[in-house]
Amino acid sequence: MALNIELLESSFSEIKAHEAEFMNYFYSTLFADYPQVKPLFANTSMKKQAKQLFKSLVFVVENLHCPDVLTEALKALGTRHIQYSVQPEHYPMVGSTLLKAFSICLDSAWTPNTKQAWSEAYAVITELMLSGAEYPIEILTLQQDDDQTVLRDLN
C-alpha cells in the first residue's frame, strides 16, 4: 500500500501547532472510550507519556520517505510495548482514538482523503509494531463504516 505522504505531512504540520490540545484530547478520549486501558498507565507520568507519543508521531511523519528506518523503529517499538503489557486488542483502541483526535484538531481539514491517509498509515504502523511484538497481523483489520473508520479486533 502506497501511503499519501504529502497529505500525511501537510495535515500533521497543522497538528504540530496544537500539540497540547491534540494530546489532551487523545488521552481523555482514550480513557473515556476505553477505560480498560487506563491501568496500563498507572505508573506513568502522563505528561511524559504524551510528549513521548507525540515525539513518536513526529518521527513517523519525518521518516515517511525512509521506510527502512520506520520499519526498524516501529518493530522495536512494538517489542518494547510488550513490557508495558500492551495486547493486540489495544491497537484498535489507540487507532480509533488517534483518528478522532485528528478529526477534532484538523476540523475542516479532516477530509475523506485525510481520513483515508491516516487510516492507512495507522494500519502500517500497527502491522509493523505487531510484527515486532510477534503478534499475527491477521487478528486486526481496518474496516470502513459509513462515516467512521474503525479498527476492529477479529477475535
Q: At which residue positions do the language-model features occur?
A:
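Globin-like tetrapyrrole-binding proteins
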Residues: M1-N155
